[in-house]
């Protein structure tokens, strides 16, 4: 019974016994030989061979002798190879490509079946198309064909406003498409090249990460949903701002395009060609560079100074292609230049002089009291011209006129007070200064002090509508313009040239009736003399000029054709006075936001067709108003302290702006006592205060019409009564029907009159006389009493007549009768 149950479960009812407990089985007898003789012979042969093999395997065998070790063949000695000359360049090691990070792996995995390449006619990938939410989307500026047999034949709908085109995705591909989301809080997101930062409403990536050919790639969150589609990018120094297409919570498409955006379609670029003499070469691959041949490199730049690809040529000249990785911190465009001496109008605030820190120009275009100064010294470079953050170099005033260096702590800037230095590069300084009438740049060291002062009025500046001396810590941010402190940005160009030689008498020495040429240490000078015959020469050591006896017979000058200097009017320029070269002007003026104070909000009191502003501020604050009708009548006033200002408000409205607060608009909503939906006297009272003339005319017209109607009705009633009573008046002792008597107010039968009746009662029964006389008085008293009870009800909603019109706050008087706006 149990066996059948457990067999259903596929196992035995009890575990099988181990081998030691199994019963011994009888050895089966050998099978009887088959009758077939051939099969018997084969079986015997197999048994014999098996016994032979097993016997040899179990038989002990003597050990085999160990083979002798092999002798190593000695390779013939080769003659030593000659050493390669040091001039031969070593092969560069190809840097290993870094493995993709987690974000890149996730993006690559999701893009595998949902992102398609867009290729041009040559088969090059110039962008991408995206399958998302039942549509295939492609940037409009990517001109090419989708690399897919089905998607390439779809008909696309173009939208130039969003720089996108889309088509319906085939049904069999919709299940694998991306999904999008309108939620993108600030943080980091994923795309093909790693992480994308979203902050301040913008997507940014590190500089150099993305580029041409990435147009159409998606930006995804950690769930794989598409947050944005990349269209291009704008270089902003250390980071690149992306131009993207996103969606809001209502599903509406939003395109964000930073200033200076370039489309990232990998269109074929036309190589710009530059010239050197009659030879043309690609501007990005010049035949030499500045570190190899300084003079020739400057010749190339000067010949192509007006070329469209001048910046490309300048970067290539500075960074030699075979010199390995160039370091931006060591080599930049100001490496081509040199400091110089210039004429300063005020040295130590006294007399003009030659100064190593001559101020060429001062710009104060920023809104945050920051100024940009150009001098003849160079900041951020050491004596050799290499970039050094804590050094500056200047032209010495001594006889050798060599370039010397110092630390940036020696540089002082001041106006009416000390300035705070913000940044520096080349000839330029960026500083925040207090207001003043002049700008002074000084070199203050332990040995000497040199300064230069330029008369330039620096006015106090503030942003917004409230004056302040220092920016507040808390307040409101409003748009303003500031100088970009990044040294890589450019605000244009400054013109450069290679100066003509300068002759210095310090290069000549007269001793014992002889004239010697004395060059500075390590420099070459050229002398020209007229001592009978014309003599000239270039020397690097102290050399006697034969035949000359006085210094006035010679001139000696030093010529350096490997450096540019600023095209200053103090220097001897070349003959045509045109710019030979140009360099970038740093510290670009860019739009930004500045923190400004916000004054206390005014206390507003509303009245009939006017408002009162109770203002209180401890600094100058601007109050402006204007009417919103056809005649604005604007007003402006700077206010400080406590004050009250009253303004009239008409139906068109009034707008006022107090300090840096948002504009406020008020309108006159006229009202009056009474109720337009109440009792007749309330209606008349309401419209009488709103439109008195029209109300009087309407009431008068209604009264006249009513009086005419009542008069006509009375006359008609009298005529009808007379016509009804005439037949009965002509018949003696006629009895008038009761209904007609009631209708016409006549007695149905002859009776005594009221006078006769009262006379009779006075003569015969005076108590009844007084009772009869009190009946009308009692009726009059009852009527007056009823009127006194109904009067409070009829006048419950009536306002006092002297209140006048006010700005309404509610529709009915029983709700709130005293509160006004």
Curated annotation (Swiss-Prot):
Q: What is the effect of changing residue 215 to T?
A: 90% reduction in autocatalytic cleavage by capsid protein. No infectious virus is produced
Q: Which residues are glycosylated?
A: 278, 524, 646
Query: Does the keyword Nucleus belong to this entry?
Result: no
Ribosome-binding: region residues: 93-101
In the record, the effect of residue 215 to C is given as:
40% reduction in autocatalytic cleavage by capsid protein. No infectious virus is produced
Q: What is the effect of changing residue 724 to A?
A: Loss of palmitoylation
Q: Which residues form the active site?
A: 141 (charge relay system), 163 (charge relay system), 215 (charge relay system)
Q: Which reactions does this protein catalyse?
A: Autocatalytic release of the core protein from the N-terminus of the togavirus structural polyprotein by hydrolysis of a -Trp-|-Ser- bond
Residue stretches making up the Peptidase S3 domain: 114-264
- Domain of life from the UniProt record: Viruses
- State the residue spans of region: Functions as an uncleaved signal peptide for the precursor of protein E3/E2: 265-279
Record site feature (Cleavage), residues: 264-265, 328-329, 751-752, 806-807
Q: Domain notes, please?
A: Structural polyprotein: As soon as the capsid protein has been autocleaved, an internal uncleaved signal peptide directs the remaining polyprotein to the endoplasmic reticulum.
Q: What else is known?
A: The strain HRSP sequence is shown.
How is this protein named in the record?
Frameshifted structural polyprotein
The species this protein belongs to is Sindbis virus (SINV)
């Amino acid at each position: 019974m149990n066996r059948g149950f457990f067999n259903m479960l596929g196992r035995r009812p009890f575990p099988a016994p181990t081998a030691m407990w199994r019963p011994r089985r009888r050895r089966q007898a050998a099978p009887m030989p088959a009758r077939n003789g051939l099969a018997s012979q084969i079986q015997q042969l197999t048994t014999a061979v098996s016994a032979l093999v097993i016997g040899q395997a179990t038989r002990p065998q003597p050990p085999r002798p160990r083979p002798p070790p092999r002798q190593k063949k000695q390779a013939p000695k080769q003659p030593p190879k000659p050493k390669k000359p040091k001039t031969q360049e070593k092969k560069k090691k190809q840097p290993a490509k870094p493995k993709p990070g987690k974000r890149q792996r996730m993006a690559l995995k999701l893009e595998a079946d949902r992102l398609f390449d867009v290729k041009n006619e040559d088969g090059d990938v110039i962008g991408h198309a995206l399958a998302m939410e039942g549509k295939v989307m492609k940037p409009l500026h990517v001109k090419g064909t989708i690399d897919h047999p089905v998607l390439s034949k779809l008909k696309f709908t173009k939208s130039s406003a969003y720089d996108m085109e889309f088509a319906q995705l085939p049904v069999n591909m919709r299940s694998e498409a991306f999904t999008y989301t309108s939620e993108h809080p600030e943080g980091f997101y994923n795309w093909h090249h790693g992480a994308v930062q979203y902050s301040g409403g913008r997507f940014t990536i590190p500089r150099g990460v993305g580029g041409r050919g990435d147009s159409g790639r998606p930006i995804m969150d950690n769930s794989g949903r598409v947050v944005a589609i990349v269209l291009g990018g704008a270089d902003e120094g250390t980071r690149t701002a992306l131009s993207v297409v996103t969606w809001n919570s209502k599903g509406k498409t939003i395109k964000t395009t930073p200033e200076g955006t370039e489309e990232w379609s990998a269109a074929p670029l036309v190589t710009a060609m530059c010239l050197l003499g009659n030879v043309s070469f690609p501007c990005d691959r010049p035949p030499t560079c500045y570190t190899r041949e300084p003079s020739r490199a400057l010749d190339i730049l000067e010949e192509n100074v007006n070329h469209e690809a001048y910046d490309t040529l300048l970067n290539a000249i500075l960074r030699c292609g075979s010199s390995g990785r160039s370091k931006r911190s060591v080599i930049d465009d100001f490496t081509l230049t040199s400091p110089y001496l210039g004429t300063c109008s005020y040295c130590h605030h006294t007399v003009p002089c030659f100064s190593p820190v001559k101020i060429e120009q001062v710009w104060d275009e920023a809104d945050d009291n920051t100024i940009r100064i150009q001098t003849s010294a160079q900041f951020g470079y050491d004596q050799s011209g290499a970039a050094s953050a804590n050094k500056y170099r200047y032209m010495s005033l001594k006889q050798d006129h060599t370039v010397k260096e110092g630390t940036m702590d020696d540089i002082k800037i001041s106006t009416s007070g000390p300035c705070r230095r913000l940044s520096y590069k080349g000839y330029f300084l960026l500083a925040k200064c207090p207001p003043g009438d002049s700008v002074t740049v000084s070199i203050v060291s332990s040995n000497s002090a040199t300064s230069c002062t330029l008369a330039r009025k620096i006015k106090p500046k503030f942003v917004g509508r409230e004056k302040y001396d220092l920016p507040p810590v808390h307040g409101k941010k409003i748009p303003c313009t500031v100088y970009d402190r990044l040294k890589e940005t450019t605000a244009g160009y400054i013109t450069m040239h290679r100066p003509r030689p300068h002759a210095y008498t310090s290069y000549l020495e007269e001793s014992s009736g002889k004239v010697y040429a004395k060059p500075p240490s390590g420099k070459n000078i050229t002398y020209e003399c007229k001592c009978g015959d014309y003599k000239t020469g270039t020397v690097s050591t102290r050399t006697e000029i034969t035949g000359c006896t006085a210094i006035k017979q010679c001139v000696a000058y030093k010529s350096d054709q490997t450096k540019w200097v600023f095209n200053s009017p103090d220097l001897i320029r070349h003959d045509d006075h045109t710019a030979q070269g140009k360099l970038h002007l740093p510290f670009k003026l860019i739009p930004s936001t500045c923190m400004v104070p916000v004054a206390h909000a005014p206390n507003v009191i509303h009245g009939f067709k006017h408002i009162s502003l109770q203002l209180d501020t401890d600094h100058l604050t601007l109050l402006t108003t204007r009417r919103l009708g056809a005649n604005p009548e604007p007003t402006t006033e700077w206010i400080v302290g406590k004050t009250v200002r009253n303004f009239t408000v008409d139906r068109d409205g009034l707008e006022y702006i107090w300090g840096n607060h948002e504009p406020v608009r008020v309108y006159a909503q006229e009202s009056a006592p009474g109720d337009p939906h109440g009792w007749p006297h309330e209606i008349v009272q309401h419209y009488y205060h709103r439109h008195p003339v029209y109300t009087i005319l309407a009431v008068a017209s209604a009264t006249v019409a009513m009086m005419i109607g009542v008069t006509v009705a009375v006359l008609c009633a009298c005529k009808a009564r007379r016509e009804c009573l005439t037949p009965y008046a002509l018949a003696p002792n006629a009895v008038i029907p009761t209904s007609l008597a009631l209708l016409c107010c006549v007695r149905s039968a002859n009776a005594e009159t009221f006078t006769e009746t009262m006379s009779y009662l006075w003569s015969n029964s005076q108590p009844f006389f007084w009772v009869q006389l009190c009946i009308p008085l009692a009726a009059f008293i009852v009527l007056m009493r009823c009127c006194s009870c109904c009067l409070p009800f009829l006048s419950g909603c009536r306002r006092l007549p002297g209140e006048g019109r006010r700005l309404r706050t509610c529709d009915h008087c029983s709700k709130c009768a005293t509160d006004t706006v």
